[in-house]
Regions:
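Extreme N-terminal starter segment of soluble prokaryotic enzymes
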Residues: 5-6
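Acetyl-CoA-dependent GNAT
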Residues: 9-75, 98-99, 136
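Hydrophobic adenine-recognition pocket in adenosine-nucleotide-binding enzymes
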Residues: 10, 82-84, 117
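Conserved acetyl-CoA binding element of GNAT-fold acetyltransferases
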Residues: 75-86
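Conserved active-site alpha-helix within GNAT-family acetyltransferase domains
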Residues: 95, 119-138
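Conserved GNAT acetyl-CoA-binding A-motif
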Residues: 98, 105-117
Length: 146
């Protein structure tokens, strides 16, 4: 699969498929909602969304990466989401998407890239470890509606 996967920047016309794939990650949404979110991401100069297309031209995955200037550490990027279609996993598409995000982050002068992964996603943890990431922290996440 590696040599049959093409990565490109996401376009607004990808919204429906990105929404469908988001459901695989446990974040169901509608195509309409995703189109609005994707518009914001596409226009954000501090973020990027890349998609992976199979050799047959179907969209099989996406990655969203962003960077924020920080006071406490050198500039770093963060993977906000990465998903590959369940039928296309373990064939290299995720690593190719991760590579595209890392290249983008280096172009933004980032010194590192981090990712947060649910403690239940053990398969994902192995993926990140195999791709050179290290487990460096365990934390609790808090949120408040505004």
């Amino acid at each position: 699969m590696k040599n049959k996967v093409r990565v490109r920047r996401a376009r607004s016309t990808d919204a429906a498929r990105i929404a469908e794939l988001s459901g695989h990650l446990g974040y169901p949404t509608t195509a309409k909602q995703m189109k609005a979110r994707l518009k914001d991401v596409i226009e954000d100069k501090e973020g990027a969304c890349f998609v992976a297309e199979s050799g047959e031209g179907g969209l099989i995955g996406w990655i969203h990466v962003s960077t924020t200037p920080l006071l406490e550490v050198e500039r770093r990027a963060e993977v906000n989401g990465l998903v590959v279609d369940e039928t296309a996993r373990s064939r290299g598409a995720g690593a190719i998407l991760l590579g595209a995000a890392e290249k983008w982050a280096r172009g933004k002068r980032c010194k590192s890239m981090s990712v947060r992964s649910n403690v239940l996603r053990e398969r994902a943890h192995g993926f990140y470890l195999r791709n050179g990431y290290e487990h460096y922290k365990t934390q609790k996440a808090f949120r408040k509606g505004l």
